[in-house]
Amino acid sequence: MVLMIVSGRSGSGKSVALRALEDMGFYCVDNLPVVLLPDLARTLADRQISAAVSIDVRNMPESPEIFEQAMNNLPGAFSPQLLFLDADRNTLIRRYSDTRRLHPLSSKNLSLESAIDKESDLLEPLRSRADLIVDTSEMSVHELAEMLRTRLLGKRERELTMVFESFGFKHGIPIDADYVFDVRFLPNPHWDPKLRPMTGLDKPVAAFLDRHTEVHNFIYQTRSYLELWLPMLETNNRSYLTVAIGCTGGKHRSVYIAEQLADYFRSRGKNVQSRHRTLEKRKT
């Protein structure tokens, strides 16, 4: 059974995550004090029910040792997993402005910006030991729920899920990436007026990139690197591996490369997902 601990900065989507986990059959508790985690787990152990608990800055233990002690006292039937949700500072500020809610630390006479920064410092002990960090900056409520369903169901099946995501460096590097590869040195379809409106998912762009030897070499060497270390990653109690491929805008080269790598590992029987951050952002 799984004990999913959901944490993250306020406004990053913890309530959405908890609702998604409840839909997946988890017994969910919002803002349970850390010291009560072992008691909850023992209560649910006999019923064979996986649980999800949210922890935010209001019920953080006074010291990391208290959290470690609670984890050590969990029944052996439970496998604890820590999910940490985050978003960039500007996104969190915008979400608070849209909802007009008060930040949990606002009562300490802090501005919203200062409260967000302070919260980040207080939650760092949890973030540093998270099994999965999810950046929700560009996600809608439905996208976050769907992403959690695909990733966490894979985790419960103890199967490594390889996630290949494209992005644009001008929009920032994904904070949930395990590996980041820069493909800005490859030939750029952007400079062809006919290809500029298209994306790396379109056949003319794929044909353009497929004509270049350096593109083939990059794909071959990247997949060879991943194949070399994949067996160790699979035996290291991991459930996911996020590989981010970045070009300038996240529209052509990174999309094509991410899809090529995803197709290759999918053909090898791996559990593979692909997503394209810039293209998804353009849809919203």
From Swiss-Prot:
<keyword id="KW-0067">ATP-binding</keyword>
<dbReference type="Pfam" id="PF22740">
    <property type="entry name" value="PapZ_C"/>
</dbReference>
<dbReference type="Pfam" id="PF03668">
    <property type="entry name" value="RapZ-like_N"/>
</dbReference>
<comment type="function">
    <text>Modulates the synthesis of GlmS, by affecting the processing and stability of the regulatory small RNA GlmZ. When glucosamine-6-phosphate (GlcN6P) concentrations are high in the cell, RapZ binds GlmZ and targets it to cleavage by RNase E. Consequently, GlmZ is inactivated and unable to activate GlmS synthesis. Under low GlcN6P concentrations, RapZ is sequestered and inactivated by an other regulatory small RNA, GlmY, preventing GlmZ degradation and leading to synthesis of GlmS.</text>
</comment>
<feature type="binding site">
    <location>
        <begin position="56"/>
        <end position="59"/>
    </location>
    <ligand>
        <name>GTP</name>
    </ligand>
</feature>
<keyword id="KW-0694">RNA-binding</keyword>
<keyword id="KW-0547">Nucleotide-binding</keyword>
<dbReference type="InterPro" id="IPR027417">
    <property type="entry name" value="P-loop_NTPase"/>
</dbReference>
<dbReference type="InterPro" id="IPR053931">
    <property type="entry name" value="RapZ_C"/>
</dbReference>
<feature type="binding site">
    <location>
        <begin position="8"/>
        <end position="15"/>
    </location>
    <ligand>
        <name>ATP</name>
    </ligand>
</feature>
<comment type="subunit">
    <text>Homotrimer.</text>
</comment>
<comment type="similarity">
    <text>Belongs to the RapZ-like family. RapZ subfamily.</text>
</comment>
<dbReference type="GO" id="GO:0005525">
    <property type="term" value="F:GTP binding"/>
</dbReference>
<dbReference type="InterPro" id="IPR005337">
    <property type="entry name" value="RapZ-like"/>
</dbReference>
<dbReference type="GO" id="GO:0003723">
    <property type="term" value="F:RNA binding"/>
</dbReference>
<feature type="region of interest" description="RNA-binding">
    <location>
        <begin position="266"/>
        <end position="284"/>
    </location>
</feature>
<keyword id="KW-0342">GTP-binding</keyword>
<dbReference type="GO" id="GO:0060090">
    <property type="term" value="F:molecular adaptor activity"/>
</dbReference>
<dbReference type="GO" id="GO:0005524">
    <property type="term" value="F:ATP binding"/>
</dbReference>
<dbReference type="InterPro" id="IPR053930">
    <property type="entry name" value="RapZ-like_N"/>
</dbReference>
<protein>
    <recommendedName>
        <fullName>RNase adapter protein RapZ</fullName>
    </recommendedName>
</protein>
